[in-house]
């Protein structure tokens, strides 16, 4: 990861979540990864995938709440009421996170009882080109 990619990933996450305080820096434990933070909170890792000649990134964030409060938790955390959690067709173990009409990520249950979730966001190199 170079400085330009880190800056673009940071801007992409800031725009996506509507949270200008998100920061992205190199992961001190893994030189091939970055880590996203929001204030003092570590949001999660950003992993590089450059298989097949296409460079993409995967952002994962653990969410320590149950399904009924997912939307409110994310809205409060990012101070953005435009974030909405929407059920997926024929899927009961995951939901979608949108900002307005824009799809952001899939949020999947970590266990069958849905006590905790993981947000998974794919970021393609094409997503970063305009930043």
Label each residue range with its predicted role.
Residues 1-131:
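Terminal leader/tail segments of proteins
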């Amino acid at each position: 990861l170079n400085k330009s990619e880190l800056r673009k990933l940071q801007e992409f996450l800031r725009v996506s979540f509507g949270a200008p305080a998100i920061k992205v820096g190199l992961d001190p434990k893994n030189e091939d990864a970055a880590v996203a933070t929001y204030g003092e909170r570590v949001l999660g890792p950003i992993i590089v995938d450059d298989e097949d000649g296409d460079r993409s990134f995967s952002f994962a964030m653990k969410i320590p709440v149950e399904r009924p409060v997912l939307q409110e938790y994310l809205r409060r955390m990012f101070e953005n009421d435009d974030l909405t959690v929407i059920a997926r067709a024929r899927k009961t173990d995951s939901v979608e996170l949108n900002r307005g009409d824009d799809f952001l990520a899939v949020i999947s249950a970590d266990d069958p009882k849905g006590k905790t979730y993981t947000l998974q966001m794919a970021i393609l190199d094409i997503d970063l080109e305009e930043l």
